Amino acid sequence: MLDTNQQEFVYATYPDLKGKRVVITGGGSGIGGELTTAFAGQGARVFFLDIAEQASRELEATLSGAPIAPTFIKCDLTNLDELKAVFARIQEEAGGVDILLNNAANDDRHEIEDVTPAYWDSRMNVNLRHKFFCSQAVLPGMKERGHGVILNFGSISWHLPHTQLHLYMTAKAGIEGMTRALAREVGKYGIRANTVVPGAVVTPRQKALWHNPDEEARILAGQCIPERVEMTDVAALALFLASSNARHCSGREYFVDAGWYGA
């Protein structure tokens, strides 16, 4: 196995991200926490939303020495009134949003027979619906300014033969369609929209609930590059897509999966 993951990861620097107003949903831990760390390191003004207060407060304290200390806002994104209030607060404090990263999600496992209408609705609300309404909240300002970036975070799961993820995979498939439709409608206003599709990223949640050596060996054997995809790899792609270097990248899915899918 290659050992490049043992080297210290250093992000590329994108000067145009400095001072940008960035909102990251689910930004308190896991991939979202790394996104918060990466954008704060670029000098962006980051607001990160999460329902998990303890982990988010700890991250906020850890990053207090960033060029612009990120701001944690507790928010249940499945509550649309709460969501709208949070974006109204950000508008008042920062004057708008330049970059939106719709990352929040929950990949609970389930059996088909156990799914109720209420559970269906809850999974769509936590994995898909808020991405639309967060985008809706920032679009007026982006249109007025003539620029903006929306990155929706999908999943490799529905591209591969997984089980017990029926609703998660349904929502993640919907994200790609929603993003393409959004990109088509808002491109004329200078706004870009893309989907970031992480591969088998071992997050703290994955390690605690599902990860094991046999599963990792199986995944690595299926990848073109037989090494683990790290959270920093996902954040590095997001930085590029949010920057002006990706100014003609829109309406597409960008995989960071070490060649697990499609090769």
Model-found features: residue ranges?
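Active-site loop-to-helix junction immediately N-terminal to the catalytic Tyr of the SDR YXXXK motif
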Residues: 107, 115, 161-169, 181
